[in-house]
C-alpha cells in the first residue's frame, strides 16, 4: 500500500474566529462572513447592528470568557432580509375522548450576516460630551 500524504491545510486565523453572543433571548455561535436567522427584530433591511452581549470570544490566538460578558467586545451584523421560517404543526389529541386540535404557525425571522467580530482597541468608543446651559440673567 502506498502512503497517501495529504498536504497540510494552511490555517487562516479568520477561520478560527468565533463568538458566542446573546441575542433575542438565545445564545448563538457566530463566525464572520456567515449568515444566521434571529427572531424578528425592528431593524430595516441593510441596517448594521452591533451586538455587545458577547459571552465568549475566540480570535484565533486567544480565548476570552466573559463574566458574564466580554469587556469591549462587539459583533457587527448586517440585516439581509425579513422572512418566515418553515411551517410548524402542533397537533394535540386526547385519547378515547374524540378530542383533536391541529394548529400551525410560521415563525417571523430576521436573516443577518456577521460582518466583523472585534475586541479592545479595534472598537471605536463614542465619548458623550456633557453640556450645561448657562443661565442668562435678565435686568
Swiss-Prot record:
Keyword Magnesium: no
Keyword annotations from UniProtKB, A to Z: Ribonucleoprotein, Ribosomal protein, RNA-binding, rRNA-binding
PROSITE patterns: RIBOSOMAL_L21
InterPro entries: bL21-like, bL21-like_sf, Ribosomal_bL21, Ribosomal_bL21_CS
One GO term describing the cellular component: ribonucleoprotein complex
Any one of the GO BP annotations: translation
MF-aspect GO terms: rRNA binding; structural constituent of ribosome
Domain of life: Bacteria
NCBIfam families tied to this protein: L21 (TIGR00061)
Subunit structure: Part of the 50S ribosomal subunit. Contacts protein L20.
Family: Belongs to the bacterial ribosomal protein bL21 family.
PANTHER family reported for this sequence: 50S RIBOSOMAL PROTEIN L21, LARGE RIBOSOMAL SUBUNIT PROTEIN BL21M
HAMAP family per UniProt: Ribosomal_bL21
Protein role: This protein binds to 23S rRNA in the presence of protein L20.
Protein known as: Large ribosomal subunit protein bL21
Amino acid at each position: 500500500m502506498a502512503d497517501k500524504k495529504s498536504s497540510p491545510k494552511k490555517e487562516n486565523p479568520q477561520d478560527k474566529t468565533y463568538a458566542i453572543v446573546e441575542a433575542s433571548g438565545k445564545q448563538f455561535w457566530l463566525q464572520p462572513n456567515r449568515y444566521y436567522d434571529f427572531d424578528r427584530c425592528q431593524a430595516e433591511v441593510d441596517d448594521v447592528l452591533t451586538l455587545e452581549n458577547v459571552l465568549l470570544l475566540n480570535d484565533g490566538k486567544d480565548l476570552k470568557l466573559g463574566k458574564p460578558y466580554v469587556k469591549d467586545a462587539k459583533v457587527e451584523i448586517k440585516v439581509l432580509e425579513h422572512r418566515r421560517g418553515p411551517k410548524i404543526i402542533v397537533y394535540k389529541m386526547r385519547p378515547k375522548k374524540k378530542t383533536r386540535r391541529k394548529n400551525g404557525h410560521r415563525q417571523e425571522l430576521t436573516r443577518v450576516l456577521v460582518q466583523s467580530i472585534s475586541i479592545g482597541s479595534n472598537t471605536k468608543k463614542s465619548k458623550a460630551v456633557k453640556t450645561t446651559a448657562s443661565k442668562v440673567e435678565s435686568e
